[in-house]
Amino acid sequence: MLRKTFKHFISISAIFVLIFSIYTYAGEYRGEVISATGEVYIIDSAGEHHAVEGPGYPVRETDTLVTDQGGTAIISFNDGVLSVLNENSRLRVEKTYWLSHLGGKIYFTFRKVFNGTRHVKTRFATLGIRGTTFIIYDNNDQQAVALQEGLLDIESHGPAFEIHRRHQLDEFEAFKQQQMQQQQKEELRKEFDEYRQQLQREFIEFKRNFSMQAEHVISFDGDRVDERVIDDDAMADFENFEAIAGDLLEEFREQARPHRENIESQPVLDEEDFE
């Protein structure tokens, strides 16, 4: 009798352990694939590959989304993110408010939220995000971020970045106009060379974290960061991603609009409001 009861207890315990293991293995639901073309699959926490053959495929914590040559995928996350993976790209899903870019070219657009900053971790930096649209590049050709709108906080994984900020050519034009009437051309060029060297010294910074403004591109080469105004190539990439997303992106933006307007209508509190 005792032996039979013990066996019954062991069987029930095993069932509970199995159920718990399945629940843990599945991970928390984070969103779903809303469009997929070509070779797209998900690698789960156990390393199993699951082909994504159409919309509605659930995405959970610890899943890694992968697109092969010619594949694209659009994922809608439940914390207010829409992401578009280009071919040969990998995106790991972490806990809420966290994603990890593992490689390739991926487009992100984030809704504004009340409760804290979202993050995307890359191999070269961690990006802190609030209501932003940007592309991350990480392939054999480059490691870079192109920011269309919003603001990004860039944080190093290790030592301080050596940040080089390119100055606009209109600085030279303004300088030239001011000096043209007083200096000969050769003297003007000499003065401007000295002025440009001074600007270059002033716009090299060493920081572990810094802010990136909209309509700029930053490129990474080890600890060196080069910032420049967004160029035609980056703008073409945004247009290509928006064409891939099509109506799905428009629906996402429409859903985000009331939330954004609600945030923007909130009063800005001064320090004395907390005293």
Q: What are the functions of these language-model segments?
A:
Residues L2-A14, Y23-Y29, G47-P55, R60, ...:
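C-terminal interaction modules
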Residues G27-I43:
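Short N-terminal segments immediately surrounding and downstream of signal-peptide cleavage
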Residues E39-Y41, L91, Y107-F108, I135:
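Active-site/binding-pocket entry motifs
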Residues V59, L65-L127, V145-I154:
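Short, small-residue-rich packing micro-motifs
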Residues G38-V40, G70-T72, T132:
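Generic short beta-strand segments
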Residues G128-F134:
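Active-site glycine-rich loop that binds ribose-phosphate moieties when present
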